[in-house]
Regions:
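Short acidic-glycine-tyrosine-enriched beta hairpin
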Residues: 53-55, 90, 95-115
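Bacterial N-terminal signal peptides
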Residues: 7-17
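Double-stranded beta-helix
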Residues: 25-27, 119-153
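His-enriched metal-coordination microenvironments in redox/metal-binding proteins
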Residues: 41-42, 54-58, 73-84
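Positively charged n-region of N-terminal signal peptides that target proteins for export
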Residues: 1-5
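Glycine- and acidic-residue-biased ligand/ion/polar-headgroup-sensing regions
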Residues: 67-70, 77-97
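Conserved short histidine dyad/triad with adjacent acidic residue
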Residues: 60-77, 101-105, 113-115
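A short, N-terminal "cap"/entry segment at the start of jelly-roll beta-barrel domains
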Residues: 21-60, 145-153
């Protein structure tokens, strides 16, 4: 009886742990099929959504391409995210101190907790990131005047 109960609990735990990307058929996206679009927030950056809809509460896998010498001011996200640097050298700093940061080379991974202030930048080369999070997406700039969406209006 105890074994059955433990197996049932373990089965439920595994079921709840399966990401929301589960589907009936395999999905393959080759690099040649990627259609990069203008990033909705950062003019000059590009993005492609590989999995999910960032307006919905589901698993999202997104790539973002930043040009050289690009800066993202201090901001937060309402979700935690796992970021992998695919190419280029990327800088990330926690908090709003613009002098401190960690250099991340291709293959580096960093995890950002929800609602933690951070800012990022590139130096002399283009950077491509892959970002994994659970939507809906969102960004809040610490200084509202830094929000590029407001500057575009």
């Amino acid at each position: 009886m105890k074994v059955r109960l433990l197996l049932a609990i373990a089965g439920l735990a595994i079921g709840f742990a399966v990401p929301s990307i589960a589907q009936d058929t395999m999905k393959v996206v080759t690099v040649d099929e990627l259609v990069w679009k203008e990033h909705p927030v950062f003019k000059g950056a590009q993005t492609v959504i590989l999995v999910g809809d960032p307006t919905k509460a589901e698993t999202i896998v997104q790539r973002v391409k930043f040009p050289p010498h690009f800066k993202v001011p201090p901001h937060t996200h309402p979700y935690s995210e796992v970021v992998t640097v695919l190419s280029g050298t990327y800088w990330n700093a926690m908090g709003d101190d613009l002098e401190k940061g960690v250099m991340l080379k291709p293959g580096s991974v960093f995890v950002l907790p929800a609602n933690h202030t951070h800012h990022t930048w590139t130096t002399d080369e283009e950077v491509i990131l892959q970002i994994y999070f659970t939507g809906p997406g969102g960004i809040t700039f610490i200084n509202p005047a830094d929000d590029p969406r407001k500057k575009a209006q």
